Every structure is written in C-alpha cells, then in structure tokens.
Amino acid sequence: GFDTNDAEEEGLRNWVRNIVNEGVTALLPTTITQSEEVLTNALKNVARVVREGYTGAEILGIHFEGPYLDMKYKGAQPEQYIRKPSVEQFKKYQEAADGLIKYITMATEADEDFALTRYCAEHGVVVSIGHSAATSQEAVQAFAHGARSMTHVYNGMTPFNHRANGLVGAAYRMKSMYGEI
C-alpha cells in the first residue's frame, strides 16, 4: 500500500499514476498525525511532485488529518504527536506544502477561540471536525467560525445518544454541513 507520510516522491508518482486503474480521477493525499519532521517531509514531497509534474489522478491538494486531535477519539493516530491547534505551526506546515493543504481534520473544541478554524476558513482551507470529543453544541460553534465538514462520521467522534446528540447528531441536523462517511 501507499502512505503519504512515508512515501518518497517516486512512490507518490507511482500511486497517482496507478490509482486511475481503480477508477480514481482526483484525490487529496492524506497525512496522519506524526512528528513535525515527518509531516513536513511528507508535505514537501507532495508539493514537489505537484510542482514538477506527474501523470495520473489529479492531486487537488492535501488533506491534513491531525495532529490537532482529541486523545480519546484519536483512533490509530499516534498519541505522542497529538498537539493543540496552533495557527503559527499550521502556517509552517502550509509553507512546507506550498499552500497545498486544502482540507484539515481537527478537534475544533481544542482550538482556543477557534483561532485555527477561522484562519483556515479565511485562507481557503476546508475545516472538517474529526477525531473529536466535541458536543453537538460545540460543533455548531465551530461551524459558526468556519468549519464546514465532518470527517468519517460515526468514527472517531462523540456518538449519537438520545440525551446528548454528539457530533453524529450535529451531522444529521446541520443542513450546511458536509458529513463524510
């Protein structure tokens, strides 16, 4: 298989060239939570491939999944690299990616004053709530500050309950929100 975090440029080129055989015409290579060094290298690799050219499925940008996640709902994401959302750190990642981060999955309830949520929304990066312990009400607040999506609804988030609707309940209620399954 292929992992955006581990791949060298040639691996990425082979992946996008061959994935069209599976019917994929466009994609967002996705990173997962890792050390700053590993993430920076992965972002630079994708940016270099896009800049130098390739054949195959179109790379629309990068999906940056983590490291701004909730420990309880981290799933397979390595907890030693989970961080609080930081605009300054994200700017460094976006610079390494040559501006290609177009979609970010994060636990918006950990985003103090929704600073990173707002920054991303203002700079054309889709904010998606995922790997999150947010309540339904916190999701509504995140959407008021620019979040637009939920990453893999039902997985890595507060569940639906008749007394506490969680993120799953918010996904059903909010008409302007995109819920990815």
Question: Predicted segments — roles?
Answer:
Residues 1-8:
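Di-metal (Zn2+ and/or Mg2+/Mn2+) metal-binding site signature of metallo-dependent hydrolases
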Residues 5, 13-42, 57-70, 97-109, ...:
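Divalent metal-dependent hydrolysis catalytic cores, especially in the metallo-beta-lactamase
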Residues 7, 38-42, 77-85:
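Alpha-helix N-cap and loop-to-helix initiation/capping positions
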Residues 8-11, 42-45, 86-88, 163-168:
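Charged helix-capping and loop-helix junction motifs
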Residues 39-41, 72-77, 116-117, 139, ...:
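Short acidic, glycine/serine/threonine-rich loops at helix termini
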Residues 42-56, 140-144:
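Short amphipathic alpha-helices and their capping/turn segments at secondary-structure boundaries
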